[in-house]
Design a protein with these regions (language model features):
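Short, conserved DNA-binding cores of transcription-related domains
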Residues: 1-87
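Acidic/histidine-rich catalytic cores and adjacent linkers
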Residues: 30, 34, 39, 46, ...
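Short, positively charged, Gly/Tyr-enriched micro-motifs
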Residues: 54-163, 199-202, 347-348
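Gly-rich Lys/Arg/Thr-decorated short loops/hinges at beta-loop-alpha junctions or inter-strand turns
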Residues: 86-87, 170-176
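Active-site beta-loop-alpha junctions of metal-dependent nucleic acid enzymes
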Residues: 93-96, 177-198, 204
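The DNA-recognition helices of helix-turn-helix-type DNA-binding domains
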Residues: 124, 135-139, 224, 244, ...
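Short secondary-structure boundary/capping segments
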Residues: 168-169, 220-225, 241-245
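Short alpha-helix plus adjacent loop in nuclease-associated cores
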Residues: 233-252
């Protein structure tokens, strides 16, 4: 390993000599000596002798390398305690340099499995797992001092059988996972929510149509405005209205092509599909009326970034639709109207904001991949560290 290469990857040392073979050995010594005692701060130090410390370093041109550091042990004449000099890029008690450990962490984070990485680096699988856990824990500790984000998305995702659910807290403004906590009820999340810093600074919280999460937010985030997630509201309307169509015309259960036409937005149909849909609706006028309501309601729910003056007309239209659904003769429409009435304030707020839990759902997909890579590991703390490291 050349002096320039060592200075680029591990600065702070002077090369004494190096031996080039299958294993490249580089003999170095630290440039800076300690100036004071780490225990008492005294400046009267005495050298007690030298010793060699061997650490693994990054490979050079395909050859593994080892750095042999000539270290000194010092004694403080003020307090009488002895200590070893700190080494740049090498933590106490470690047998490898920080650049090498970070390289192993990044390669494992990129998808190289533990067994393959251990074989390539001539390490044990336990060592690779320990290095990865140390770096992820270091990243997770940085979150302890962070305040809650101003725009927060809360949703649940499933885990293994022994621990069925976990709650995800997503920073929608910065598009990253803030934290995850086991459980989804207020009793399970109470201790975690009590430890959060800056809960009073949260301005907006986006959730699905969950009564338990709404009650939880009103208690623990009193200054936050609750916004309904647009995807879940539109899906709720689609499910109930299409259920009416299936009850009116039971043949839709096996005529999936017609059901797909009813499910698709009208402006996304090609001319052939639109002609087929018109012919079907002409034969089924009841389904035609339900389809027209579905189109108008979904178009209203998909409106974004409106000011408060523009929202006034939209509110009148929404209330008219809700009243029409609640007075309908179909039980599914009545259920939908009651749900929209109970969540009308949260639904109206989503017209003012463009952020939604689609960001959180995307991270849930990535978290499923993390669970597959860590298959068999049931420790939630380990899973949380991996999620924060890769999604935070």
């Amino acid at each position: 390993m050349s002096p320039a290469m060592l200075q680029l990857t591990l600065p702070g040392y002077r090369i004494i000599r190096f031996e080039s073979n299958i294993l490249m050995r580089v003999f170095v010594e630290a440039l800076d000596a300690p100036r004071q005692c780490p225990c008492c701060g005294g400046e009267r130090l005495r050298s007690k002798g030298r010793y060699e410390r061997r650490v693994r370093h990054l490979a050079c041109f395909g050859h593994p390398s080892e750095v042999i550091i000539s270290c000194r042990r010092y004694e403080c004449l003020a307090c009488g305690r002895s200590f070893v000099q700190p080494l740049p890029g090498v933590r106490p008690g470690r047998r490898s340099t920080e650049p090498l450990r970070e390289n192993i962490y990044e390669r494992h984070d990129d998808g190289i499995c533990t067994s393959t990485l251990a074989r390539r680096e001539s390490l044990s699988e336990a060592t690779v797992s320990r290095i990865y856990a140390q770096f992820t824990e270091r990243k997770a500790k940085e979150r302890i001092s962070l305040d809650c984000p101003a725009v927060l998305g809360i949703d649940e995702h499933t885990l293994h059988k022994g621990q069925r659910f976990a709650t995800t807290f997503c920073d929608l403004k910065q598009r990253r996972i803030f934290d995850i906590s086991p459980g989804r009820s207020e009793a399970e999340l109470r201790s975690y929510l009590a430890s959060l810093r800056g809960r009073e600074k949260v301005k907006v919280v986006c959730i699905d149509l969950s009564d338990s999460y709404r009650a939880l937010i009103k208690r623990w985030f009193p200054k936050a405005a609750i916004v309904a997630d647009r995807f879940h509201v539109v899906r709720l309307a689609m499910v109930h209205l299409l259920k009416i169509c299936r009850n009116v015309y039971p043949q839709l259960a096996w005529k999936r092509s017609w059901l797909n036409l009813l499910r698709t937005r009208g402006d996304r149909l090609d001319p052939l599909q639109a002609a087929r849909l018109r012919a079907f609706l002409n034969e089924q006028p009841v389904i035609g009326a339900v389809y027209a309501m579905k189109e108008r309601l979904c178009a209203l729910l998909c409106v974004k970034t409106q000011n408060r003056y523009q929202c006034r007309d939209l509110i009148r239209t929404l209330l008219a639709y809700i009243e029409q659904l609640r007075t309908s003769s179909f039980p599914e429409a009545q259920t939908l109207g009651k749900t929209l009435h109970d969540w009308q304030e949260e639904i109206v707020r989503m017209w003012r904001f463009s952020k939604n839990n689609g960001i959180t759902e995307g991270f849930h997909r990535k978290m499923k991949l993390i669970q597959r890579r860590a298959y068999g590991i049931k420790s939630f703390d380990n899973y949380r560290l991996r999620v924060i490291a890769q999604c935070g």
